[in-house]
Structure formats: structure tokens, C-alpha cells
Swiss-Prot record:
Role summary: Plays a major role in decreasing resistance to glycopeptide antibiotics.
Extracellular topological segments: 71-460
An example Gene Ontology biological process: response to antibiotic
Cytoplasmic domain ranges by topology: 1-49
Protein's UniProt name: Membrane-associated protein TcaA
Mode of membrane association: Single-pass membrane protein
Organism of provenance: Staphylococcus aureus (strain bovine RF122 / ET3-1)
Length: 460
């Protein structure tokens, strides 16, 4: 369709004269218009053919860009760079994230110690070089799947391994720090509380038993901790250094505000060694001059005394108080017994014992003769006066005499004797009828006019 330039009437393209006003159309203009429409149509067809190619080319460009973006963040080299940057910049949180595994959570404080350990024991420049070379070799290798970075002394500090792929094209590199178990061995049952893996942790260690406190990555550690024992609560640190271990464990050094007590006794020469005790803060323990007692908290006073026995009587020292301000890691104290009081008592008891032993010597000399006469004559009356009537021993000897099973004895010796009220216990060494030397313990009762009678006996 075309419009008449004179009256505006619409007309077909092939009409040459306007039917309304008679205006004659220009045939060249119509021909040009037709040619132009055909060109436009041809160009449209060409454009429609080019669109798929343009879209495909655009998608290809996007894929190439995406590949390079993925490579920048996911290639082994890129993964290495992330770890290197974190260590170079002391980014402990990033290092903790990279090194944490399902089985071992690494917290930021551990990561901080680890970063410092790498810089001290490997050197940052050497570590970066070793890491890049290791990753490059693993990436190119078809057989190797893991390798270690080591310190100057040859200890493993980082395990680098291939762990599948990322986005099909790139090897996935895993960075894992090897771990060791720090171990404690307290002298008494101890509870330790500290922070590990970002969480509070409690470990209970039995006395004189090796106990691990967890798994830690390489480093030189000084961990704030609290420990509790029967003696009290202590604030301090648990210290351990991977440089000091060539095994799977590392010894822990305890650094707490504690006092250890060495005790010296004076005036105790007459006391039985096995009876000597030390009482610290109401807790009684056996005494040893070579033993150190503790540890005890340095922030609390300590009360201490000692006791011991001589001839059955207990003697004690005065109780001393050690002020908290005077407590040191190694604290010495001397406790004094009243030696004169002890010696006077021992002398008195020895006189009594000598008198008692003399009585017993006389008694058992007569008893052994009576016993043998009863055996030879099969007559209980010979020995009955030496045994208390109604006692189980009385009935037993009477039965043995009647059966002829009474044992003959000779050469009685008094080894030891003690008197408690009207009861006496005596250890007597005898020769039996087989000629063998035996020790027997007798219990006697002292009646009126100091008369002694046997109540019971037993083998020592």
C-alpha cells in the first residue's frame, strides 16, 4: 500500500493514478520501495541464521571465563595459595578451618601455635617452597597420593594428599597436620580443665598412671588450665613441646602455683619408724625423710604436724602453720618431738618389760615341763594349772592329751611381750618334738597375786 502525496488517499502499490484526485504516481519510487522491502526481508533471514551462532559463541566465552574463575579458586595451585596466604598473614581462623577434620577439630589458638611453629622450625620461605613443590609433584603424579612437609629436624609438620577432584578437572588437595598425644602422670588422682578444639575439656588422671589429654597438632604449647586434687585447686599452665618428642606422645610439664613440702623430724630417734606419720591439712600420711608432700595451692595456709609411737604410746609434735605468703614451690619445715618425754617413757616401759619378760621366762619354763609331763603320762592334770579353765585353749589341750596328740616343746625364749591391763601377749620361740624352731603367739591373763594363765595360742 501507498498514500497519495496530494490527497492522502490509500492505493495499491501497482496503481499509477489516484482514483480520488487523479494524481499520477511516480513508478520509480514504487520500484525503489519494493526493492527496499525485499532487501529488508533478505537481511532478516540472514540475521535469523546468525543468532544461534552468536548465542553459541557467547556461551563458549562464558564457559571459558567460568573455567578460569574455577581454576583461580579450585586448582591445586589455588588451594595451596589459600593456605600459604593464611599462614603468611597469621590468619589463625582460616588455618584452623583448613586443618580441621571430622576426627580432630583445630581451634584458632592451636592454629596460632602451629603458624609460629612453622615459621620457627621450617622457615616461611622454605615452607612455601616445599609446599608448592610437593603439590606440583602430587598433581603430576599418577601413583603418589600423599606426601609430608618436614621441619629442619625431620619431623612431619603437614600432610598433603590428593582427595578426589573438584568440578571434574581439578585435583582436590587436602592439608592435614599430624597429631600427637600429650600425656600426664600425676602423683595422685587429678582433674585437669582446659580449652581444646574450641571447647572446654576435662581430663581425670589416676595416680601414677600415664593419661593422654587429647590430640594436638605440632607446636610449642602453654595452655591455661585448672587442676584439682585432694589437696585443693590450682591455676596454671600445661606445657609441652613437639620438638622434645620422637614418638606418638609428648610429655606434659605442669606449671601451676603449687607448693611441695619437705619435712624433717627431730627428737624422733626412739619412735618406731613404721609408726611415724605426717598430718597436713587434717590428712594423715606415712612419713619418709626422702618424700616430698604435695602439691598444695600457694594461695592458702597449710597446717602440719607429726606423730609416732614408742612402746605402744603415740607422741605428737606441735601443729605448725605455714602462711600462704611463705609458701614456695619447694618449702622445707622442721617438726620437733619432746625427746626427753619420749626417752623417759621408753625407759619406764623397758623396766616394766624386763620385769614382765622375767615373769614369762619363769612361767614358760614351768609350762614346757608340765606340757611334756602331760604328754608322757597322758595326764592333763600336770598342765591344767597353767591354762585358764573354761577357755577354748583349756578344752583343746585336754582333748589332745586324751588322744595322745599333744606336741612336746622345749627351750622356750621370750621374743616379745606386751601388757594391756590384765591381758598379756607374748611371742615365744620354741623347739618342737621334730627339732624345728617355731614362733608361737600366746595370750595370757594375769589374775590375783599376779598368777598367769594361758587363754589361747596361735602360730606366728
Amino acid at each position: 500500500m501507498k498514500s497519495c502525496p496530494k490527497c492522502g488517499q490509500q492505493a495499491q502499490d501497482d496503481v499509477q493514478i489516484c482514483t480520488q484526485c487523479g494524481h499520477k504516481f511516480d513508478s520509480r519510487q514504487a520500484l525503489y520501495r519494493k526493492s527496499t522491502d525485499e532487501d529488508i526481508q533478505t537481511n532478516n533471514i540472514k540475521m535469523r541464521k546468525m543468532v544461534p551462532w552468536a548465542i553459541g559463541f557467547f556461551i563458549l566465552i562464558l564457559i571459558i571465563i567460568l573455567f578460569f574463575l574455577l581454576r583461580n579458586f579450585n586448582s591445586p595451585e589455588a588451594q595451596t595459595k589459600i593456605l600459604v596466604n593464611a599462614i603468611e598473614n597469621n590468619d589463625k581462623q582460616k588455618v584452623a578451618t583448613l586443618l580441621s577434620t571430622k576426627d580432630n577439630k583445630v581451634d584458632s589458638e592451636e592454629a596460632k601455635v602451629y603458624i609460629n611453629y612453622i615459621k620457627d622450625e621450617v622457615g616461611l620461605k622454605q615452607f612455601v617452597s616445599d609446599l608448592k613443590n610437593t603439590v606440583h609433584k602430587l598433581n603430576k603424579s599418577k601413583t603418589s597420593v600423599a606426601s609430608y612437609i618436614q621441619t629442619r629436624s625431620g619431623q612431619n609438620i603437614l600432610r598433603v594428599s590428593k582427595n578426589g577432584t573438584r568440578y571434574i578437572f581439578f585435583d582436590n588437595m587436602s592439608f592435614t597436620a599430624p597429631t600427637k598425644q600429650p600425656i600426664v602422670k600425676p602423683k595422685e588422682k587429678t582433674k585437669y580443665e582446659f580449652k581444646s578444639g574450641g571447647k572446654k575439656k576435662m581430663v581425670i588422671a589416676e595416680a601414677n598412671k600415664v593419661t593422654p589429654i587429647g590430640n594436638f597438632i605440632p607446636g610449642t604449647y602453654r595452655i591455661p588450665a585448672m587442676k584439682s586434687t585432694e589437696n585443693g585447686d590450682f591455676a596454671g599452665h600445661l606445657k609441652f613441646d613437639f620438638r622434645q618428642s620422637n614418638s606418638e606422645t609428648v610429655d606434659v610439664t605442669e606449671d601451676f602455683e603449687e607448693a611441695n613440702i619437705s619435712v624433717t623430724l627431730k627428737g624422733d630417734t626412739k619412735l618406731n619408724d613404721s609408726s611415724k606419720k605426717v598430718t597436713i591439712n587434717d590428712r594423715e600420711m606415712a612419713f619418709s625423710s626422702s618424700k616430698t608432700y604435695g602439691p598444695y595451692p600457694q594461695n592458702k595456709d597449710i597446717t602440719i604436724s607429726a606423730s609416732g609411737k614408742a612402746k605402744g604410746k603415740t607422741f605428737t609434735t606441735q601443729t605448725k602453720t605455714i602462711k600462704a605468703s611463705d609458701l614456695k614451690y619447694s618449702t622445707e619445715i622442721t617438726l620437733n618431738f619432746d625427746s626427753e618425754d619420749i626417752e623417759d617413757y621408753v625407759e619406764k616401759k623397758e623396766k616394766e618389760e624386763n620385769s614382765l619378760k622375767n615373769k614369762l621366762i619363769e612361767f614358760f619354763a614351768g609350762y614346757s615341763l608340765a606340757n611334756n609331763a602331760a604328754f608322757n603320762q597322758s595326764d592333763f592334770d600336770f598342765v591344767s594349772s597353767y591354762i585358764k579353765k573354761g577357755s577354748s585353749f583349756y578344752d583343746d589341750v585336754k582333748k589332745r592329751v586324751s588322744k595322745g596328740s599333744l606336741m612336746m616343746i622345749s627351750s622356750p625364749q621370750i621374743i616379745d611381750a606386751e601388757k594391756h591391763g590384765d591381758k598379756i601377749t607374748a611371742t615365744v620361740r620354741l623347739i618342737n618334738e621334730n627339732g624345728k624352731q617355731v614362733d608361737k603367739e600366746y595370750e595370757l591373763e594375769q589374775g590375783s597375786q599376779d598368777r598367769l594363765q594361758l587363754i589361747k595360742t596361735s602360730e606366728k
